[in-house]
């Protein structure tokens, strides 16, 4: 196989919290003689030999020991085949096998030369050779905002039972096992380890014996690819499941952290925290590291192990930073491994990405993956400063206030003798106390400039606070510099009175007042002080009731790209949206993921990384109530019950720009929010579900033009074994997307009644047609009993030639209170 025949793509995976930036791509293989390759074989992996999905699988809690034994025996056989192949082809040459993948995909990763990779690729039993690719790192109130205490939790017996018996696997940066959010001794209700979980707790110097318990029931780390490249420093990068970054600890706590854990930050008590499913079990698969991120070979190994261990749900707060090349975005090693995970009955949740708000910015592609975008919620921490002229200026900042008025001093007016602005060009940011004269600052409120360097992480609020404390200032106030205008500010913790004024207009009002009160030396006109005074009110108490939810500007948007040429897929993404802005979660005190919360045990983070675990936790509640639900059934329950309105009953809005996002917003479409905003209580009683299985996904993949050899590469299955193919719009999804409607198209949907009562329910069908499209649904009325399935015919006809996307909804309204919501999107319309 020549070089052009190798599947060569490199794309970053980002931990999608909005404070982290992705690194640029690089092709390391141009400068080294060997590299890590991912090799897949034609034969099928272990999970494909079960021939079962969900309810009969290991993940149903009913798997027999003989089933597990057969799976393990098959896995051992696959590993022997891998070793034999390497010995036979490479003989006594130098190579290093890193992993055998045997459960979800049949293959291995190894350090090879290009010639060795070519020789393996030429073997009949080998289907694919892919270069490893780089991966990189991208609540106290949300349970109440989502209605869990009086809704979904009550249905499960309260917070002490919510998520009981469900295992969530997190592919992330690890976990801090000492955090009380993961203790198994919080309540008197004893945890019991689910018998279907067979994972282990790795013991290292950084993760000593006793780190795991009956809550945190498994922990491993994966770094063979990183080690082979020499980029892993065992001491600096925590070569253990311990979280030295903070991100993994945060996401795990949002989904499944214990209920009622006190949140204390910068010495301030800020309420109590809880995960969405506080009784769910946690299994950690660390594959990303604080200094360099990680590599796909390690990510795939983590996913493969999580599935083999028996997790019920996988949370992925990572996404590629660009579309995978090839005939379709769905064909990449991670998504294809996750397809096998779905076959094993595992529900997979992935963050949409933080590349919004532009259209087609979606970073999660495949229909078997549940993709979550980010919204705001209704809690804010309001702060303000009262000036001596009786003007009150609002701002943000988790800080106490000053009880009395204090004089103000601008940073550039408090320099030491001999120090000038030219000597320290960034002195206005207050990053170095040695630049200032303490006598000029002591007992006053120090006024500093908040520039774009803070947004980039070059300067930090924490360092400015240290400066203010070293100078014994009475408080600290930031005004917004023009370079940072338009960026959305969050409430940073401050251990002295402080405030960040985020409005340019209010910042100018502060400076005008200060400058109007300047004191100058007679004769020289030199500034010797200011008569201006102010009082910081403080921002420790949250306020509620703002318009929420709204889709955040950073949340990636649809339509879902089918390939890297901007062709749109007939798949709706995101699936729905959930809280992802200013989310409190557990944090590792050693974490370096955010400057503002270093050394703290909780942090407030934003990003679709935070949205995904909200849905992961709610999915655990559904899995607890319906243990035999397929992944598609869980996805359907979440989607069809989603809310379309904000707390005021108005249509959910979506921010449209990065700068000044609250000024530029409009009603959210399905390409912004999918089915809508997650409704935890309704999702536990959806009435009807749209189910779909592995075979349907395979028929869909086989229907993509030119896909047969690629499908064989990844699954070991031939498209010829499937009697038919399915267009994407024909998948039995709880949504309809038609990228190009030429004339008329009819699609079918199957709904199954899973109501807990045996009584029949009669549904009336209603719809709102997209612009320039006519819609007809039949039957328009039907009665369905428990466990029964009905087929719905949906016919769409283009009325005009229009190239702009338009949206509609189909609703199924049951006489027992169930409402099933089906979003519709049609992009190109060509009337015939």
From Swiss-Prot:
EC number: 3.4.21.-
Transmembrane feature ranges: none
Pfam family, one: Inhibitor_I9
Keyword line: Autocatalytic cleavage, Glycoprotein, Hydrolase, Protease, Secreted, Serine protease, Signal, Zymogen
Propeptide residue intervals: 25-138
A GO molecular-function annotation: serine-type endopeptidase activity
Gene Ontology annotations for the cellular component aspect, listed alphabetically: extracellular region; plasmodesma
Chain positions carrying an annotated carbohydrate: 29, 73, 233, 272, 315, 390, 417, 470, 515, 522, 679, 705, 713, 723, 760, 801
Domain Peptidase S8: 145-684
Secretion signal, residue range per the UniProt entry: 1-24
Enzyme class: hydrolase
Segments forming domain PA: 408-503
Keyword match Protease: yes
Matches recorded under CDD domains: PA_subtilisin_like, Peptidases_S8_3
Subcellular location: Secreted
InterPro entries listed in its UniProt record: Peptidase_S8/S53_dom, Peptidase_S8/S53_dom_sf, Peptidase_S8_Asp-AS, Peptidase_S8_Ser-AS, Peptidase_S8_subtilisin-rel, Peptidases_S8_3, S8pro/Inhibitor_I9, S8pro/Inhibitor_I9_sf
Cysteine-cysteine disulfides: none
GO-annotated biological processes: proteolysis
Gene3D superfamilies tied to this protein: 2.60.40.2310, 3.50.30.30, Peptidase S8 propeptide/proteinase inhibitor I9, Peptidase S8/S53 domain
Annotated PANTHER family: PROPROTEIN CONVERTASE SUBTILISIN/KEXIN
The protein's name in its UniProt record: Subtilisin-like protease SBT2.1
Species for this entry: Arabidopsis thaliana (Mouse-ear cress)
Native organism taxonomy: Eukaryota, Viridiplantae, Streptophyta, Embryophyta, Tracheophyta
UniProt gene name: SBT2.1
């Amino acid at each position: 196989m020549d070089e052009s025949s190798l599947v060569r793509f490199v794309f970053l995976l980002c931990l999608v919290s909005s404070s982290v930036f992705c690194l640029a791509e690089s092709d390391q293989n141009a400068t080294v003689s060997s590299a890590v390759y991912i090799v897949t074989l034609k034969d099928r992996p272990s999970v494909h030999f079960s021939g079962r999905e969900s309810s009969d699988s290991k993940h149903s809690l009913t798997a027999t020991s003989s089933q597990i034994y057969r799976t393990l025996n098959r896995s051992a056989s696959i590993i022997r085949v891998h070793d034999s192949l390497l010995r036979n082809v490479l003989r006594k040459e130098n190579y290093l096998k890193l992993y055998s993948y045997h459960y979800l995909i049949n293959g291995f990763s190894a350090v090879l030369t290009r010639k060795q990779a070519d020789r393996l690729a030429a073997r009949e039993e080998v289907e694919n050779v892919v270069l490893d690719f780089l991966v990189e790192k991208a609540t106290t109130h949300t349970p109440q905002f989502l209605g869990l205490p009086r809704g979904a939790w009550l249905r499960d017996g309260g917070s002490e039972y919510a998520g009981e018996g469900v295992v969530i696997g997190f592919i992330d940066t690890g976990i801090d096992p000492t955090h009380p959010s993961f203790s198994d001794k919080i309540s008197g209700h004893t945890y019991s380890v689910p018998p279907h979980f067979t994972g282990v707790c790795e013991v290292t110097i950084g993760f000593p014996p006793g780190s795991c318990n009956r809550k945190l029931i498994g922990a491993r780390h994966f770094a063979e690819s990183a080690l082979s490249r020499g980029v892993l420093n065992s001491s600096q990068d925590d070569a253990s499941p311990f979280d030295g970054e903070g991100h993994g600890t945060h996401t795990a706590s949002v989904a499944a952290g214990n209920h009622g854990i006190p949140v204390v930050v910068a010495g301030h008590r800020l309420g109590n925290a809880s995960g969405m499913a506080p009784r769910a079990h946690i299994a950690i698969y660390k594959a990303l590291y604080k200094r360099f991120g990680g590599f796909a070979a390690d990510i795939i190994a983590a996913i493969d192990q999580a599935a083999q261990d028996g997790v019920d749900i996988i949370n992925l707060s990572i996404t590629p930073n660009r579309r995978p090349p090839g005939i379709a975005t769905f064909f990449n090693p991670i998504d294809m491994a996750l397809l096998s995970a779905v076959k094993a009955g595992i529900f997979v949740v992935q963050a949409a990405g933080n590349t919004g708000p532009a259209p087609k910015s979606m970073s999660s592609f495949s229909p078997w993956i549940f993709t979550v975008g980010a919204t705001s919620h209704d809690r804010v921490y309001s702060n303000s400063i009262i000036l001596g002229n009786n003007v009150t200026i609002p701002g943000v900042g988790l800080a106490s206030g000053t009880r009395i008025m204090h004089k103000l001093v601008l940073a550039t007016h408090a320099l030491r003798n001999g120090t000038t602005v030219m000597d320290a060009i960034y002195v206005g940011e207050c990053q170095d106390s040695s630049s200032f004269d303490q006598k000029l600052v002591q007992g006053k409120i120090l006024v500093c400039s908040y520039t774009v360097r803070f947004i980039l992480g070059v300067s930090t609020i924490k360092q400015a606070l240290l400066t203010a404390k070293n100078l014994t200032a009475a408080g600290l106030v930031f005004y917004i510099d023009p370079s940072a205008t338009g960026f959305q500010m969050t409430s940073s913790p401050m251990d002295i009175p402080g405030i960040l004024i985020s409005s340019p207009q209010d910042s100018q009002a502060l400076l005008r007042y200060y400058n109007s009160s300047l004191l100058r030396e007679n004769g020289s006109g030199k500034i010797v002080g200011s008569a201006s005074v102010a009082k910081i009110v403080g921002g420790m108490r949250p306020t509620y009731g703002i318009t929420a939810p709204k889709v955040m500007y950073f949340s990636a948007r649809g339509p879902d790209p089918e390939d890297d040429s901007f062709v749109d897929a007939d798949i709706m993404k995101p699936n729905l949206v959930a809280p992802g802005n200013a989310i409190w979660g557990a944090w590792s005190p050693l974490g370096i993921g955010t400057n503002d919360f270093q050394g703290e045990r909780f942090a407030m983070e934003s990003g679709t990384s935070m949205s995904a675990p909200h849905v992961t936790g709610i999915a655990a509640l559904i899995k607890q109530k319906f243990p035999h639900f397929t992944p598609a059934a869980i996805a359907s329950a979440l989607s069809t019950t989603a809310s379309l309105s904000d707390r005021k009953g108005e249509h959910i809005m979506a921010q449209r720009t990065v700068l000044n996002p609250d000024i530029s917003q409009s009603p959210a479409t399905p390409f912004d929010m999918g089915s809508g905003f997650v409704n935890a209580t309704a999702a536990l009683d959806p009435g009807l579900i749209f189910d779909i299985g592995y075979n349907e996904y395979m028929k869909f993949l086989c229907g993509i033009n030119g896909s047969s050899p690629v499908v064989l590469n990844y699954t070991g299955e031939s498209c010829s074994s499937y009697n038919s193919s399915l267009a994407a719009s024909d998948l039995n999804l709880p949504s309809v997307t038609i990228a190009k409607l030429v004339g008329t198209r009819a699609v079918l949907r199957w709904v199954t009644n899973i109501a807990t009562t045996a009584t029949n329910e009669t549904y009336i069908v209603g719809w709102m047609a997209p612009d320039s499209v006519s819609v007809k649904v039949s039957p328009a009325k039907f009665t369905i009993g428990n466990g029964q399935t009905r087929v719905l015919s949906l016919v769409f006809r283009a009325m005009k030639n229009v190239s702009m996307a338009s949206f509609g909804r189909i609703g199924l309204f049951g006489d027992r209170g169930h409402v099933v919501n089906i979003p519709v999107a049609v992009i190109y319309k060509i009337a015939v």
